Amino acid sequence: MQLSRWLFSTNHKDIGTLYLIFGAWAGMVGTAMSVIIRAELAQPGSLLNDDQIYNVVVTAHALVMIFFMVMPIMIGGFGNWLIPLMIGAPDMAFPRMNNMSFWLIPPSFILLLASAGVESGAGTGWTIYPPLSSNIAHAGGSVDLAIFSLHLAGASSILASINFITTIINMRTPGMSFDRLPLFVWSVFVTAFLLLLSLPVLAGAITMLLTDRNINTTFFDPAGGGDPILFQHLFWFFGHPEVYILILPGFGMISHVIAHYSGKREPFGYLGMVYAMIAIGVLGFLVWAHHMFTVGMDVDTRAYFTAATMIIAVPTGIKVFSWMATLQGSNLQWETPLLWALGFVFLFTLGGLTGIVLANSSIDVVLHDTYYVVAHFHYVLSMGAVFAIFAGFTHWFPLFCGYNLHPLWGKAHFFMMFVGVNLTFFPQHFLGLAGMPRRYSDYPDAYTLWNTVSSIGSTISLVAMLFFIFLIWEAFASQREGVTPEFANASLEWQYNSFPPSHHTFDETPSTVVIVK
């Protein structure tokens, strides 16, 4: 009975739980890989004694964190759990397709780990650029397995996106018009469109790479009239929207958390927040070549991509200042989720500022492929997306489980993590400005100090992760009853009559839900 409940589930809460548990496991795998990277770089000289293995670990770390940690947790976990509850729907529009979306992910994960484990592994970086990923530089099955892994993960995301879009358009409760949709629902709605439009391009690119490797096509081989730069354009046309896919649901969750602990019914400038997310989604498709400033583009092309990239800072700024306006003058409840949200706003903004620096093509030519870029995207991912996940998890944990996390130890975990990630990634700005390149397993002695500091920071983050596992155990062991949060009157997900809401949210489909604004 239990086996069929979890294997053949058509229930959005069960599938959301599966996604959250899977994402937690994948997150531990990805964290372990990052600790291997930082152990190698903790001091000059070699630990692994093999640059290929080092690059395999770097590649797997990136792909695991993106496709098997952030996306399953944010979109699959929080999306499945919260969106039907927030819009007053009995479940998702296509419950069985929802189940398939989840069960495509573990085989995809196994294929990725297999790609790292067979032959000499895929040491291409997560971008899989040819000719390094061609059958000459990477003979054997590793890259092919990675390609199949991405195909499965992509198929899963496309199915999930269709499901979310259909659910949000068709299954809102009466009175829940689009201009009253909770911001998290809006964020997943926009994210689903980004996935739907960008993933097929990635699928095309990696399929062409597969045929280049195995049946002698020359899409990316100049010898047959192909061009490796074509792959970069296709990949980044997916890859740039992808980074917004990773952060947009986080924006939605942070909006809920900040409004909630400010004692507000909604964030400041609700409609502006919605338009800002849509604008970020649209602009995200128009800036992909800023990842390619060093491949030799015309100066006018570079001018366009520099300008377009900087324009994205405008809607992002609207969001940041609206969050700050929500906090302004309110009686804050200093609980753990708010700490994560404030940490998010501060550190995401810092990461955004280094992004503005990198948008300048003339500067980027110097900083491209240095640790400055690594520092930039880890500030927006490791302290943006991950902090948003922790904010959302600590906020909605009572809703999901009916129990409360330990309030004091939850705060302790936040401060431990805050120190760890900042100590890890802030020094990398210095390394990048000093010219230390990415994806190398060793470095000149001059870079020793900040690498050592960075590796100490990663050890602190590792301890924080172990402490978080203990926190979850402690919550289930102590069984402190969850109570309706004080300011939950504006959020539909807290209005159901039990924590967690019953397996089937409604005994009968509700006819009306009155929403007072």
Curated annotation (Swiss-Prot):
1'-histidyl-3'-tyrosine (His-Tyr) cross-link, renumbered residues: 240-244
Known pathway: Energy metabolism; oxidative phosphorylation
Pfam family, one: COX1
Cofactor, free-text remark: Binds 2 heme A groups non-covalently per subunit.
Keywords: Calcium, Copper, Electron transport, Heme, Iron, Magnesium, Membrane, Metal-binding, Mitochondrion, Mitochondrion inner membrane, Respiratory chain, Translocase, Transmembrane, Transmembrane helix, Transport
Binding sites annotated in the UniProt record for Fe(II)-heme a: 61, 378
Transmembrane segments: 17-37, 63-83, 102-122, 145-165, 183-203, 234-254, 268-288, 305-325, 338-358, 380-400, 414-434, 456-476
Record CDD domains: Cyt_c_Oxidase_I (cd01663)
An annotated GO BP: electron transport coupled proton transport
Family designation: Belongs to the heme-copper respiratory oxidase family.
Function statement: Component of the cytochrome c oxidase, the last enzyme in the mitochondrial electron transport chain which drives oxidative phosphorylation. The respiratory chain contains 3 multisubunit complexes succinate dehydrogenase (complex II, CII), ubiquinol-cytochrome c oxidoreductase (cytochrome b-c1 complex, complex III, CIII) and cytochrome c oxidase (complex IV, CIV), that cooperate to transfer electrons derived from NADH and succinate to molecular oxygen, creating an electrochemical gradient over the inner membrane that drives transmembrane transport and the ATP synthase.
Subunit structure: Component of the cytochrome c oxidase (complex IV, CIV), a multisubunit enzyme composed of a catalytic core of 3 subunits and several supernumerary subunits. The complex exists as a monomer or a dimer and forms supercomplexes (SCs) in the inner mitochondrial membrane with ubiquinol-cytochrome c oxidoreductase (cytochrome b-c1 complex, complex III, CIII).
Protein name, as recorded: Cytochrome c oxidase subunit 1
Source species of the chain: Paracentrotus lividus (Common sea urchin)
Top-level taxonomy: Eukaryota, Metazoa, Echinodermata, Eleutherozoa, Echinozoa
Gene behind the chain: COI
